[in-house]
């Protein structure tokens, strides 16, 4: 093979007007079929869901070499791109030279032509990118990340890198992974018998972050508008299709934004991401719609059709209580003060309003200490964006800008002042109204891909009792 000949991506060969030209493509064999005279090889290089058909006239190739080309093998092909005579593809490559980079023993290679369950593929997460399904999902994941950066960049917001190692628990939930270099077999102790973290690497108790919000607020108080986008960690012992121990979060924080502006931003943002997916990932989305979720494309278009409903929590409870009176059955009880379950959120979106909902003004008892208190003293300016199929997709609020009120709320919620002294400084010096929200990246991907298990939209899922690879 000509080592100097530039490689052409299959996506470009399929759509780039190269018919009649000699090209060099490289990729992994999906299938090989044929007869004594000719072999047809389906080659994929990850640039598109579509394979390139390679036509190899066996008289021109060594039989021993061709026998090594099996499903999973990696090869390079030089040949002429021609219009295809067969059904199923518009163009194909008439091979003049083939080089084998790596073979795949059919006796042991786990991804043979037959279909595989998603459960099985989770057990071989290191190989599942080679399947059509996961090639599609990881390309969509890339495009969604680009959409997020593009949206905020166009807004003039700055990408801010919040630390992954922290001494604060933003959510006050306490479900954090500890970071330590101490030997568990010989922990240093204080006179009171407690672990002496002064002897640890950082000289104090530290954990992996559950959110970059608090640090993000500090940046917003100087840069005006920022967003974080990075991994977060929750040591929540939940083995469900909706929970991961390691996931990615997008968290904008914007100075001078009040709750109404925050709702506008969240709606504009999520619609932008969905539209980006439809504009840039249609081949991949169509594959997922055909194989996993027939209603996927309609559901994506559904969220773009009209403005989201703005709904106060109290009114939402009234609607749900009315539904119960009319015979609707919910697993979890409905009452003012309840933290709504996914079934309640989905009823409001899918049955009652038939459009996404932004719920606001939640009881202060079920929300975090940093949310701004309303004038009624009972509710806070929190907001959740509720979507079909998954319920809450975004959670946010206007932040409490008043120092005394924030301290009072922290004390009320059992958050020690000594742990957030630096956070309180932003209210002590030049405080300003500001708002923000958090979007779990994998929740967004669940919606855009139509997949039903969050473990299938992240490359290497981390869940209880599972940290393979």
From Swiss-Prot:
One GO-annotated biological process of the protein: asparaginyl-tRNA aminoacylation
Single GO MF descriptor: ATP binding
Subcellular location, principal: cytoplasm
Origin: domain of life: Bacteria
The keyword Aminoacyl-tRNA synthetase belongs to this UniProt entry's keyword annotation: yes
Keyword check for Ligase: yes
Organism: Porphyromonas gingivalis (strain ATCC 33277 / DSM 20709 / CIP 103683 / JCM 12257 / NCTC 11834 / 2561)
NCBIfam families: asnS, PRK03932.1
UniProt xrefs under InterPro entries: Aa-tRNA-synt_II (IPR004364), aa-tRNA-synth_II (IPR006195), aa-tRNA-synth_II/BPL/LPL (IPR045864), Asn-tRNA-ligase (IPR004522), Asp/Asn-tRNA-synth_IIb (IPR002312), NA-bd_OB-fold (IPR012340), NA-bd_OB_tRNA (IPR004365)
A GO cellular component entry from the record: cytoplasm
Protein name per the record: Asparagine--tRNA ligase
Protein family membership: Belongs to the class-II aminoacyl-tRNA synthetase family.
Subunit note: Homodimer.
Keywords: Aminoacyl-tRNA synthetase, ATP-binding, Cytoplasm, Ligase, Nucleotide-binding, Protein biosynthesis
UniProt-listed Gene3D superfamilies: Bira Bifunctional Protein, Domain 2 (3.30.930.10), Nucleic acid-binding proteins (2.40.50.140)
Catalysis performed (reactions): tRNA(Asn) + L-asparagine + ATP = L-asparaginyl-tRNA(Asn) + AMP + diphosphate + H(+)
Residues in coiled coil: none
EC number from the UniProt entry: 6.1.1.22
Subcellular location(s) of the protein: Cytoplasm
């Amino acid at each position: 093979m000509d080592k100097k000949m530039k490689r052409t991506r299959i996506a470009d060969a399929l759509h780039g007007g190269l018919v009649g030209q000699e090209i060099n493509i490289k990729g992994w064999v999906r299938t090989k079929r044929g007869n004594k005279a000719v072999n047809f090889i389906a080659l994929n290089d990850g640039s598109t869901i579509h394979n390139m058909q390679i036509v190899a006239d066996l008289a021109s190739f060594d039989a021993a070499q061709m026998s090594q080309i099996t499903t999973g093998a990696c090869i390079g092909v030089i040949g002429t791109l021609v219009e295809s005579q067969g059904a199923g593809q518009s163009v194909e490559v008439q091979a003049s030279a083939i080089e084998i980079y790596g073979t795949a023993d059919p006796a042991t290679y786990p991804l043979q032509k037959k279909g595989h369950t998603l459960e099985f593929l989770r057990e071989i997460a290191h190989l599942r990118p080679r399947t059509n399904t996961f090639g599609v999902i990881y390309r969509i994941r890339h495009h969604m990340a680009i959409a997020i950066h593009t949206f905020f960049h166009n807004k003039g917001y700055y990408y801010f890198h919040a630390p992954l190692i922290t001494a604060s628990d933003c959510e006050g939930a306490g479900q954090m992974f500890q970071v330590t270099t101490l030997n568990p077999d010989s922990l240093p102790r204080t006179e009171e018998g407690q672990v002496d973290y002064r002897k640890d690497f950082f000289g104090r108790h530290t954990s992996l972050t559950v959110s970059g919000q608090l640090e993000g607020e500090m940046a917003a108080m100087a840069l005006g508008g920022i967003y974080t986008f990075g991994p977060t960690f929750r040591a929540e012992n939940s083995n469900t299709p909706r929970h991961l121990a390691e996931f990615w979060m997008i968290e904008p924080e914007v100075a001078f934004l009040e709750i109404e502006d925050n709702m506008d931003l969240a709606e504009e943002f999520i619609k932008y991401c969905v539209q980006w997916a439809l504009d840039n990932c249609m081949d991949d989305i169509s594959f997922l719609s055909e194989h996993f979720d027939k209603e996927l494309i309609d559901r994506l278009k559904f969220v773009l059709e009209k403005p989201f409903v703005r709904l106060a929590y109290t009114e939402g409870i009234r609607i749900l209580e009315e539904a119960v009176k009319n015979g609707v059955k919910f697993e979890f009880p409905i009452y003012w003060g309840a933290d709504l379950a996914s079934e309640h959120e989905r009823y409001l979106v899918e049955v009652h309003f038939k459009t996404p909902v932004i719920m606001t003004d939640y009881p202060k008892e079920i929300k975090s200490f940093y949310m701004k208190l309303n004038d009624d003293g009972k509710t806070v300016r929190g907001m959740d964006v509720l979507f079909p199929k998954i319920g809450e997709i975004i959670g946010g609020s206007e932040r409490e800008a008043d120092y005394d009120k924030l301290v009072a709320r922290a004390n009320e919620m059992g958050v020690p002042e000594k742990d957030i002294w630096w956070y309180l400084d932003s209210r002590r010096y030049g405080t300003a109204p500001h708002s923000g929200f958090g979007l779990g990246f994998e929740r967004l991907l669940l919606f855009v891909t139509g997949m039903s298990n969050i473990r299938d939209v992240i490359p290497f899922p981390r869940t209880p009792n599972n940290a393979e690879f």
